[in-house]
Design a protein with these regions (language model features):
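DPxDG-like acidic metal-binding loop motif
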Residues: 58-87
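Phosphate/pyrophosphate-binding loops at sites that engage ATP/ADP/AMP, CoA/4′-phosphopantetheine
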Residues: 42-58
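Oxyanion-binding and handling regions
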Residues: 1-22, 29, 33-37, 90-199
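Phosphate-handling active-site elements
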Residues: 49-54, 82-92
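N-terminal, well-ordered alpha-helical segments
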Residues: 36, 40-43, 75, 79
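Short, well-ordered turn and helix-capping elements at secondary-structure junctions
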Residues: 29-30, 42, 65
Length: 199
C-alpha cells in the first residue's frame, strides 16, 4: 500500500494500492492549519483503509509549488513516516496531478500570493498517462493572467483548486513503470521565507 501526502494548497492524504487506486482519503482546506491537520488525516486514512503503518510500502509526497510553511509540514511528515518504516519516499510535483492523460499542451496555474501565479507548462506524453514537463515552474504577475483565462500561448490553462494525493501516487507509479526518474525530494517553494535564520 502507498501513503500519499500533499500540503501545497490545503492538507490532503490518501492511501492507495500499489497501482495508485485510492482506498481511503481525507483532506482539510484550511491553509493555516497544516501542522494540526496532518497527523489526524494520516491516522484517519490508515484506519479507513483498514491497514496499519506496517502495511505501507512507500510514501509519495507532493513537493509543490507551494508556500514555505505548508510544504515543510507535509514533506516533513512524509519523510518522517518513510524513515520510521525504512521505506522509499517518492517526490512528485503537485502540479503534475492536473496533467494526467492530457491531449494538448497545458499550463497549470496556482495562487502564489503577493500578486503572482505559479505556473508549470506540460505537453502530452506520447504513450499517454502523466504528461511531460515542458517548462520548470515559474512565477507570473496576476495582472498578466485573468482568473477566467482558458488559453494562453497555445496551451489550455488549468487553475489549481485542490491537489489529489491519490493522483500523486498514480503519477509516481506510472513514471516508474515507464523508467522515468522521479524528482529529488526537495520542496518547490514559491519564494523564500520573509524571515531567515542568522548565519
Amino acid at each position: 500500500m502507498i501513503l500519499a501526502i500533499d500540503s501545497s494548497v490545503g492538507t490532503a492524504v490518501a492511501v492507495t494500492d500499489a497501482t495508485g487506486v485510492e482506498r481511503a482519503a481525507g483532506s482539510s482546506a484550511d491553509r493555516r492549519s497544516h501542522a494540526e491537520s496532518i497527523g489526524p488525516l494520516i491516522a484517519h486514512a490508515l484506519a479507513e483503509a483498514n491497514i496499519t503503518a506496517a502495511d505501507v510500502t512507500a510514501v509519495v509526497m507532493g513537493v509543490g509549488p507551494g508556500p514555505f510553511t505548508g510544504l515543510r509540514v507535509g514533506m516533513a511528515a512524509a519523510e518522517a513516516f518513510a524513515w520510521g518504516r525504512e521505506i522509499p519516499v517518492w517526490a512528485v510535483r503537485s502540479h503534475d496531478t492536473l496533467c494526467v492523460d492530457i491531449d494538448s499542451d497545458t499550463l497549470v496555474v496556482s495562487d502564489a500570493r503577493r500578486g503572482e501565479w505559479a505556473c508549470t507548462r506540460y505537453t502530452p506524453h506520447p504513450e499517454g498517462g502523466p504528461a511531460l514537463v515542458s517548462s520548470e515552474t515559474f512565477l507570473m504577475p496576476r495582472a498578466e493572467l485573468a482568473p477566467d483565462t482558458t488559453e494562453r500561448d497555445g496551451a489550455r490553462v488549468v487553475f489549481v483548486e485542490e491537489v489529489s494525493p491519490a493522483v500523486l501516487a498514480t503519477v509516481a507509479v506510472s513514471r516508474q513503470a515507464r523508467g522515468e526518474t522521479l524528482l529529488d525530494p526537495r520542496p518547490l517553494y514559491l519564494r523564500q521565507p520573509d524571515v531567515t535564520m542568522p548565519q
